[in-house]
Amino acid sequence: MKQYFYLFNYPPEEYDLCALEFKYLFHEEYQQCFITNKDIDVNISVFMKGKIDIWAISSNFDDLKEEVKRQNHNHQDFKVIYLKNPISHPDYQETLDKCKDISWFIAGSVNMSKPKPTLALTKVNDLWIIGYYHHGVPSWKKYDDKPNTFSNSLDIRLARTLINIAGENDQTKTMIDPCCGMG
């Protein structure tokens, strides 16, 4: 079964809002680093920093390399990054070495400036994780600029979070904004 790693980030004053949104998206108690089999678009949440479509997980880095080698990945113009997280803090040089080390087990060519795809490596609670990386680039962010400085409308981060809570990640639901155009 396919698994996904999610990393959340929030300002301290928005912890409760982030935890509530997390509960409605995943139907679980909040965790800042979370592994699940639910595939949720990273762009729908203001709090999702990143997502990894997991290829392999292992407590031993050498075993992780062997699993990546066994899967026989081949990518042109890929890049391996280390995804920082608040739980584990390997030394910076170690993260560079690990990214370089695992990239030898991926066939293809490396492109550091314009990669496609970006692969992420991270370590959480003594578990090494690698896979495709998705960084949130929310399309709704373009609405962050209010039409006027005196606008009464909700902050876009709050509005997006309320939509996620109300919709519970059900993409088939249609919602109507009763104040549409209030601006």
Locate the predicted segments by residue:
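Non-catalytic nucleic-acid substrate-recognition regions in nucleic-acid-modifying enzymes
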Residues: 1-112
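SAM-dependent Rossmann-like transferase core, predominantly class I methyltransferases
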Residues: 127-169
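A generic local secondary-structure boundary/capping motif
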Residues: 108-110, 119-120, 164-166
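Short beta-strand micro-motifs enriched in acidic
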Residues: 122-124
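Class I S-adenosyl-L-methionine
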Residues: 111-116, 141-145
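Short, amphipathic alpha-helical segments
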Residues: 93, 115, 152-156
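A broad, low-specificity signal marking well-ordered, structured residues that form hydrophobic/aromatic
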Residues: 78, 119, 128
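Conserved class I S-adenosyl-L-methionine
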Residues: 171-181
